[in-house]
Regions:
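Charged helix-capping and loop-helix junction motifs
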Residues: 148-154
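Structural signal for conserved beta-strand scaffold positions within catalytic alpha/beta enzyme cores
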Residues: 79-81, 134, 198-200
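Canonical P-loop GTPase G-domain recognition
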Residues: 155, 159-168, 173-218
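Conserved ATPase-coupling elements of RecA-like P-loop NTPase cores
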Residues: 89-92, 143-148, 178-182
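Conserved G1/Walker A P-loop phosphate-binding module
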Residues: 1-108, 126
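Loop/turn-to-beta-strand initiation segments
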Residues: 75-78, 130-131, 166
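Fold-independent oxyanion-binding glycine-rich loops
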Residues: 80-83, 136-139, 173
Length: 218
């Protein structure tokens, strides 16, 4: 069947980077050149620093694509890139001093960024996802410290727990094998009783993705 993966969490943690790498590694290689080009156009942009780049919820790709998991298990997969929960210090949430208005698939009119993050995460998880992935960070890249992400991370995790969908937390880090990252993952596991893995979203390998999916699906 189709597996829809809702990618949620605070803004500026690498959600779009995760989706881009995921598609490049497991979906694109199995497609024709024309199809690859079409899907590449749909991949989210990743930003750096403090600026929020994802301002609307997107289904990527538009149609579910078949991928092979492990030995021979074929599933059709589609990822959902959601507007993240706001964190202190991130810019791009206001325009001309007012809260930025963003488009969502659920309302005809644009709604304030903060609302879009909350409603978007709820809808993505409730209505569209088979499994969830919360992407957060240990603060080792970008310019925002780890503490700035805790509150938004908690909102995302609690939202997923409410929906009772299987999910996993990824701690995106420049150095996923170093103590700081591992300690962050450990704290999240203890605090929320969830599985948390450390990864570098920008350098994900195919086996990382297999490991992530196996942890959530089985």
């Amino acid at each position: 069947g189709d597996i829809y993966i809702g990618v949620v969490g605070p803004v500026r943690t690498g959600k779009s980077t995760f989706i881009r790498r995921f598609m490049e590694l497991v979906a694109l290689p199995q497609m024709s050149d024309t199809k690859q080009a079409e899907i590449r156009d749909q991949l989210p942009l990743s930003g750096s620093g403090k600026i929020i780049t994802t301002a609307e919820t997107k289904f990527i790709p538009k149609e579910a694509v078949p991928i092979t998991l492990g030995e021979d298990q074929q599933v059709k997969i589609r990822l959902i890139d959601s507007v993240g929960f706001l964190v202190k210090g991130a810019s791009g949430q206001t325009e001309d001093g007012k809260e930025r208005m963003v488009k969502t698939p659920w309302f005809e009119q644009a709604i304030p960024f903060r609302e879009a993050a909350r409603i978007g995460t709820q809808k993505v998880i409730q209505e569209h996802s088979t499994i969830g992935i919360v992407v957060t960070t240990d603060g080792s890249f970008g310019e925002l410290p780890r503490d700035n992400f805790s509150e938004a991370e908690e909102k995302a995790i609690q939202e997923l727990k409410k929906q009772q969908k299987p999910f996993i937390v990824l701690v995106n880090s420049q150095m996923p094998y170093k103590d700081a990252a591992l300690k962050t993952a450990e704290e999240i596991q203890q605090k929320y009783k969830v599985t948390a893995l450390t990864v570098n979203c920008d350098q994900l390998r195919k086996e990382d993705i297999a490991r992530i999916l196996e942890k959530v699906l089985y």
